[in-house]
């Protein structure tokens, strides 16, 4: 299932995420099978780009890689880009981090 949310592109690896702000802590949640997205919980509020910055910082720490928001900068549904990892690397890391796996 997770492989459907991680896609290869010319620029790198794309991950479809669903963001919840104002969380108790920053964490990767579970797979939202209905929306086909990985849930990310962030402590920051979505004000003046604070949540987006927190998402980037949080995911950089997990993937040890550059992270860019590819689409959805003003939405809770986003696609992030990891330009310097393989799909297998990303899937392996996510499987270790996701709560429901």
Swiss-Prot record:
InterPro entries given in the database record: DUF167, YggU-like_sf
SMART domains assigned to the protein according to its UniProt record, in alphabetical order: DUF167
A Pfam entry, by short name: DUF167
The organism's place on the tree of life at top rank: Archaea
GO cellular component: cytoplasm
HAMAP family: UPF0235 (MF_00634)
Family: Belongs to the UPF0235 family.
NCBIfam families, sorted: DUF167 family protein
Protein name in UniProt: UPF0235 protein MMP1055
Species of origin: Methanococcus maripaludis (strain DSM 14266 / JCM 13030 / NBRC 101832 / S2 / LL)
């Amino acid at each position: 299932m997770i492989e459907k949310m991680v896609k290869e592109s010319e620029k790198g690896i794309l991950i479809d995420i669903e963001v919840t702000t104002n969380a108790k802590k920053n964490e990767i949640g579970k797979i939202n099978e209905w929306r086909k997205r990985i849930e990310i919980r962030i402590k920051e509020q979505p004000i003046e780009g604070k949540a987006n910055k927190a998402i980037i910082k949080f995911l950089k720490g997990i993937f040890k890689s550059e992270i860019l928001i590819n689409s959805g900068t003003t939405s809770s549904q986003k696609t992030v880009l990891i330009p310097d990892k393989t799909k297998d690397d990303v899937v392996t890391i996510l499987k270790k981090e996701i709560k429901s796996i």
